[in-house]
Amino acid sequence: MEIVCEDFQKALTKIKLLRENANIIEETVQRSVREIVQNVRESRDEALSFYTKKFDGVEIKDVRVSEEEIKQASMFVESSFLEALQEAKKNIISYHEKQKRQSMFDCTSKGIIRGQIIRPLENIGVYVPGGTASYPSSVLMNVLPAKLAGVKKIVMVTPPRAGGIDPHILVAASLAGVDEIYMIGGAQAIAALAYGTESIPKVDKIVGPGNLYVALAKREVYGIVNIDMIAGPSEIVVIADETGNAKYIAADLLSQAEHDERATAICITTNIELAKEVEKEIERQLETLPRSEIARESINRNGAIFIVPSIDEALQLSNEIAPEHLELHIKEPMNALAYVKHAGSIFLGPYAPEPLGDYLAGPNHVLPTSGTARFFSPLSVDDFVKKSSFLSYTEEALRDVKHHIVELANKEGLHAHARSIQIRFGEEE
């Protein structure tokens, strides 16, 4: 892992290059995704069968997982896993319940009524990855906020394996309250949710992380359906001063690096000795890490340790990066929170490591990546509702303001708008 001693602008340039390298998208992949989406739109289940056999090596007669399979899944998971899942569910619900908002009703003078109605989406699709790792936690993080919002129907898709779907995924789906589960993955699953097929219902919104093909497919169908966000590779920035623990920092950097080779792991520190210790510790921990090949490739391609003169500059650099995850291993981390402008999720102190947020604490782990934390937010209950405004005026109330409306409408050249007001008072031209 490279240790970089640069001024602010040079450090920022290097970091941007790391991110660009992580987000390079082959044009051939984009073309392939576009073709898959179009074929599923046109051929529906026939295309799903073709791509499932091609990409997953599995022939499936019925893509829907039966209720019996879901019930039997609990026989194949550990009691300790169920206990952990229940604890995570409790914390996720308690956190997200506080995000729920009420409809607004505002009654002003002269009988003017204005308001906003908040309603849940009717149905959503949740994508759960099934590649080099299985993610039951993603089921909870995507489904529970939707349930709290009041979504009527939740459909889940996840790639099939030779032996079926990982029972841990099925148990998590059952616990979270998923209504239907389908054995389908990749760009073809996103297309099926967006357009509908003979077997899979069309939904109003698609959420959930996935690989590059899934992310590009979500971009392709956006507008046909809504999506949560277009997630890029996982990323973490750790800011540390001389109080930082090299073992903790190295472990936290590797916790993101093991996701995939395109993940980004960056440490920004004011202490050169700590930087050297972190570098050594990463090498030591990689030797015993089961996913060391993936993590090492990620660290070599997209990892770095930056030396800066002050924590203030470290925070400025982090704000320019706008990372998915930001850890603060510094004295008085709570005092620095006010200076963090852009980050998906912020972890304060040595005992709030990023995996705590990934699995158990309650805040959502579906976060903006690739700098989009500047304008996107973590997944929340708000993502599963829509809002309608309403208003009611009395004749007297409209009469009082009609001249303003007519003036504005005529100024914009929209004379039918003006007439719509005037005709109610016998003033049409």
Curated annotation (Swiss-Prot):
NAD(+) binds at residues 127, 188, 211. The keyword Oxidoreductase applies. The active site is at 324 (proton acceptor), 325 (proton acceptor). It is an enzyme of class 1 (oxidoreductase). SUPFAM superfamilies: ALDH-like. CDD domains: Histidinol_dh (cd06572). One of its GO terms (biological process) is L-histidine biosynthetic process. Its EC number is 1.1.1.23. Signal peptide: none annotated. InterPro entries: Ald_DH/histidinol_DH, Histidinol_DH_CS, Histidinol_DH_monofunct, Hstdl_DH. Pfam families: Histidinol_dh (PF00815). Substrate binds at residues 234, 256, 259, 325, 358, 412, 417. PANTHER family: HISTIDINE BIOSYNTHESIS TRIFUNCTIONAL PROTEIN, HISTIDINOL DEHYDROGENASE HDH. This is Histidinol dehydrogenase. It comes from Bacillus cereus (strain ZK / E33L).
